[in-house]
Amino acid sequence: MNQSCPNKTSFKIAFIQARWHADIVDEARKSFVAELAAKTGGSVEVEIFDVPGAYEIPLHAKTLARTGRYAAIVGAAFVIDGGIYRHDFVATAVINGMMQVQLETEVPVLSVVLTPHHFHESKEHHDFFHAHFKVKGVEAAHAALQIVSERSRIAALV
């Protein structure tokens, strides 16, 4: 499926957020939306989609990419070691799935799916990752603007 990015200043980005550790993941979304608004004067529309966990992000991203409505898609989740399963397997599956979606649909899929080596339900860890997700949201906004711009530039060459 060949989908070109919009060749205009106004476009849409889908933001898919996992609801596990929502209080932390929400910080990425809030800073992402705020940074896009600050950088574009509100010309970029962000549509928010909730999924139960990180594992559901790739399928949701693929479904949204196929609509042709979005110049880019962002997935955000916090995959931690809960002591029951190997969280790194889940994170790898999610990231690989997101990569596959963008390669198949030609819609950029950006990741704010973070997997710490260790996370403990302590105030110190919570505060650290709360702040870290804010930073990652801003970084994702910059990356989204850059990749949409570059994709538009490439589309103009074809």
From Swiss-Prot:
Q: Where is the active site?
A: 86
Protein family: Belongs to the DMRL synthase family.
Task: Tell me what reaction this enzyme catalyses.
Answer: (2S)-2-hydroxy-3-oxobutyl phosphate + 5-amino-6-(D-ribitylamino)uracil = 6,7-dimethyl-8-(1-D-ribityl)lumazine + phosphate + 2 H2O + H(+)
Q: What does this protein do?
A: Catalyzes the formation of 6,7-dimethyl-8-ribityllumazine by condensation of 5-amino-6-(D-ribitylamino)uracil with 3,4-dihydroxy-2-butanone 4-phosphate. This is the penultimate step in the biosynthesis of riboflavin. The isozyme RibH2 but not RibH1 is essential for Brucella intracellular survival and replication inside macrophages or in mice. Displays low catalytic activity in comparison with the isozyme RibH1. Is a highly immunogenic protein.
Q: Where does 5-amino-6-(D-ribitylamino)uracil bind?
A: 20, 54-56, 78-80, 111
Q: Tell me the Gene3D superfamilies matching this sequence.
A: Lumazine/riboflavin synthase
Pathway(s) annotated for this protein in UniProt:
Cofactor biosynthesis; riboflavin biosynthesis; riboflavin from 2-hydroxy-3-oxobutyl phosphate and 5-amino-6-(D-ribitylamino)uracil: step 1/2
- Which HAMAP family would you find in this protein's record? Lumazine_synth (MF_00178)
Effect of gene knockout: Cells lacking this gene are not auxotrophic for riboflavin and grow at wild-type rates in both rich and minimal media. But simultaneous disruption of ribH1 and ribH2 is lethal. The ribH2 mutant shows a decrease in survival and replication in macrophages at all time-points and is attenuated in mice.
Task: Please give the Gene Ontology molecular function terms for this protein.
Answer: 6,7-dimethyl-8-ribityllumazine synthase activity
Q: What upregulates or represses it?
A: The two ribH genes may be differentially expressed during the Brucella infection cycle. Brucella would use RibH1 for flavin biosynthesis during the extracellular phase and RibH2 during intracellular growth.
Mind telling me which SUPFAM superfamilies this protein's record contains? Answer: Lumazine synthase (SSF52121)
- Keywords for this protein: Cytoplasm, Riboflavin biosynthesis, Transferase, Virulence
Q: Which domain of life is it from?
A: Bacteria
BP terms from Gene Ontology: riboflavin biosynthetic process
InterPro entries under this entry? LS (IPR034964), LS/RS (IPR002180), LS/RS_sf (IPR036467)
Task: List ligand-binding residues for (2S)-2-hydroxy-3-oxobutyl phosphate.
Answer: 125
The UniProt subunit note reads as follows: Homodecamer, arranged as a dimer of pentamers.
Looking up CDD domains in the UniProt record yields: Lumazine_synthase-II
User: Which Pfam families does the protein's record reference?
Assistant: DMRL_synthase (PF00885)
Q: What is its main location?
A: cytoplasm
**Subcellular localization:** Cytoplasm
What's the protein here called?
A: 6,7-dimethyl-8-ribityllumazine synthase 2
Documented EC number(s): 2.5.1.78
Q: Which gene encodes it?
A: ribH2
